[in-house]
Design a protein with these regions (language model features):
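Aromatic-lined carbohydrate-binding/catalytic grooves of carbohydrate-active enzymes
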Residues: 1-133, 137, 144-146, 151-165
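Active-site and adjacent substrate-binding regions of carbohydrate-active enzymes
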Residues: 130-183, 193-196, 253, 259-284
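Structural recognition of the beta-strand scaffold that forms the well-ordered cores
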Residues: 12-17, 57-61, 146-150, 190-193, ...
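Carbohydrate-binding surface patches
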Residues: 279-281, 285-288, 293-295, 330-370, ...
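Aromatic-lined carbohydrate-recognition surfaces of secreted/lumenal glycan-active proteins
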Residues: 56-70, 174, 178-202
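Solvent-exposed beta-hairpin/edge-strand motifs
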Residues: 366-382
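C-terminal beta-strand-rich structural cap/linker in extracellular carbohydrate-active enzymes
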Residues: 387-409
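Glycan-recognition surfaces
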Residues: 102-103, 123-124, 184-299
Length: 409
């Protein structure tokens, strides 16, 4: 389905996501061989399967996790060493927070139960670096092109939205792990950092991967999780911005300055109320340089695949054209006006309506774009609108317009 519907439009990857606690199939070094025990085939099979169809495989996993199956088996050794994997984690640690079952060990999560709760690597133990870097290289050998590393905030300080849920490993150890991963990845696999605190404007994360999340999970989808929830609020921990809209505005220039891609999480167009909301979601992610991560399924997408297939908009991604908001203050109305520029000099002007009421928009080209007049093309209507000195429209609730302006001297 993906190969037929989306590969012709430039989509290049299928990535796994989410819960891996039901996967206990490991190799002799403790590395997972598949996403779930019910899977018949391993990572390499699916990577090769996708490659034959013009796609790459992305995998959701954190190399600092250790499967309980590896801890139980003393013969599972860190690759290239005689060190049992069970010796590179703290088995005696007892978390005194929410841990009703009194599970022992430095665990990723405590409510899951003894047999399913993953362990964290102890970076100060012999073999830890070899294990983490070996995991990254293992995925490379499986022809995996993209590694989606989740729950980084939980490792750094054990905090989730201001609440303690696990052990605080410290920012120094967190940074050390990211450096190990970066070194092992080289230019052979793309690293995506998920659920980072991004403390001090991302001082630990920038340079450690190609991409990082800037908002909470898309969850149940819809406009609320894309734009409305906690609108105008900013936090000093994960996630500093709740929604994709807030995150893309706030982090736009900071990420660009560090040559890193903003990840706004998945899109499920089937959860939006109408096509206007869908077009706004796709437009914003494209102009901001975020990946279009389709999480609709073949049996849920209904008649909205065409919104992912707008070739005039997708061309902006192929040309690596970034747009930026006039203001990175999410409370400022100018944050809904974005401007980008092609190498040929053409201007991409995008305007959004985040509100539930119709909104009048008027933009004077001379004042905002520093040009007197321009030929205007609407990239959703696929129509030339003629020469204009300003643009005036009534935006529908949650709607947008994306225009290409060719300046006239």
């Amino acid at each position: 389905w993906v190969a037929k519907e989306f590969v012709p439009y430039g989509y290049e990857m299928v990535c796994t996501d989410g819960w891996i606690e039901d996967s206990f199939c490991i190799n002799e070094n403790g590395y997972l061989t598949r996403h779930h025990d019910s899977w018949k085939h391993d990572w390499k099979y699916w990577a090769d399967y996708l490659n034959e169809r013009g796609m790459a495989l992305g995998v959701y996993y954190n190399p600092t996790w250790i499967s309980p199956a590896a801890v139980k088996n003393k013969e599972i050794l860190v690759k290239g060493t005689n060190i049992p994997v069970r010796e590179i984690t703290d088995l005696s640690y007892v978390y005194n927070g929410e841990n009703e079952k009194k599970i022992t060990g430095d665990r990723f999560s405590y409510p899951n139960g003894e047999d399913r709760a993953l362990y964290w690597v102890d970076v100060d133990r012999s073999g830890a670096k070899e294990y983490v870097q070996g995991y990254v290289k293992y995925f490379i050998d499986c022809h995996v092109a993209f590694l989606r590393i989740d729950f980084l905030s939980w490792y750094e300080d054990g905090m989730d939205k201001g609440k303690q849920i696990g052990r605080n490993h410290g920012s120094a150890n967190y940074r050390k792990v990211l450096e190990w991963i970066k070194e092992a990845a080289g230019d052979q696999i793309m690293i995506s950092l998920v659920m980072p605190h991004l403390k001090n404007n991302g001082e630990n994360e920038f340079g450690m991967g190609q991409m990082a999340r800037i908002n909470e999970d898309s969850g149940t989808g819809g406009w609320d999780t894309f734009s409305d929830r906690n609108r105008g609020l900013h936090f000093d921990y994960w996630s500093q911005c709740t929604t994709a809209f807030e995150g893309l505005i706030y982090w736009s220039k900071i990420f660009a300055d560090h040559n890193m891609i903003m990840d706004a999480d998945m899109l499920r167009l089937n959860t939006f109320a109408n096509d206007e909301e869908c077009k706004s979601a796709v437009s914003l992610e494209l102009i901001a340089g975020a990946p279009l991560d389709i999480a609709d399924q073949y049996d849920t997408i209904k008649d909205r695949a065409w919104i992912y297939q707008n070739e005039e908009l997708l061309a902006l991604n192929k040309k690596e054209i970034l747009s930026f908001p006039l203001s990175t203050d999410t409370k400022n109305p100018d944050s809904t006006i974005w401007i980008g520029k092609e190498a040929t000099g053409e201007i991409i002007l995008s305007v959004f309506n985040r509100d539930a009421e119709e909104k009048e928009v008027e933009i004077d080209f001379k004042q905002v774009l520093l040009c007197r007049a321009a030929s205007v093309r609407d990239l959703w209507m696929h129509e030339d609108l003629g020469e204009m000195k300003s643009f005036h429209t009534m935006l529908p609730p949650h709607g947008c317009r994306v225009l290409k302006l060719s300046e006239r001297s």
